[in-house]
Amino acid sequence: GGEVITISASDPNGCHINALDLSEGYGDGKEPLVMKSEFIMSLYEQLMGADKIEPQEKSIIDRSVGNIYREYLKNYQGKPPTLKNLYDDLMKQVNPEAHRIALALELFTVGSLNVFSHQTNINTKSRILCFDIQDLGENLKSVGLLVMLDAIYNRVIQNRREGKYTHVYIDEIYLFFANGSGSGHSITNYSSEFLYKCWKRFRKYGATLTGITQNVEECLLSNTARMMFANSEFLLMLNQATTDREQLARLLGASDTQMSYVDNAPAGHGLIKVGGAIVPFANELPKNTELYRLMSTRPGEE
């Protein structure tokens, strides 16, 4: 069976996912704390903004991460730490900079937006999981996407240990790159890099990761996203704006003739790139079918 997990900051008694959950085998099982520390940096960056995270802050956070995971990593028994534990550890330090970081995180740890600072209270063992973060609001949506990806990463690791294959789909993947600057560098660098690591690692973990977006322009501003486009074995393109077509053509080595298939293309028409081959496709679903009724999202169609 499947389960829809709706995460909302406005429901204190609703679903919670611990942002600091850590499965045995996390990060290849060799240096789990290293990758988890990188994830927490990503989380902090999303919460506070990349322009507010300094080298000394990174060192302080890394130290606290080691402190709060020390006991749990001995045997992975009991409950993993939470963001509240991170907040408490930062407040215990004598360094005033640590207190400043803790206060900056207070809203998201002990304040009204603490939805990810609780122990996980949902069933993550269902065969199909759908994480719904629509109700999180703008302050937490990008953070929610990152926490969901980490939760999925933990599940992929568990499935691998049990010999199960995993299919992962991320809608609105552009949010990982939404603050990309015109220079081609992502402001949310840790977040996009964490996604890129998952993009590369999931395959050897027995999983496929598929990203979906209508905002390819945001992605093309990020060097990380461009590498993901260029190195993806499978790419499906529907109708594209003129500037996006030009950039995609250069990135993928596609000809003008090929790119014409995503110029004013009708619904269900476009290009598929598989390995080194790029071919046009048409996939029109008859409107008088049950499948069309189930899959259509057009207003007024039931």
Placement of each model-derived feature along the sequence:
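P-loop NTPase motor domains
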Residues: 1-2, 7-11, 15-207, 220-223, ...
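C-terminal regions of RecA-like/P-loop NTPase motor modules
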Residues: 219-302
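H-loop/switch region of ABC-family ATPase nucleotide-binding domains
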Residues: 213
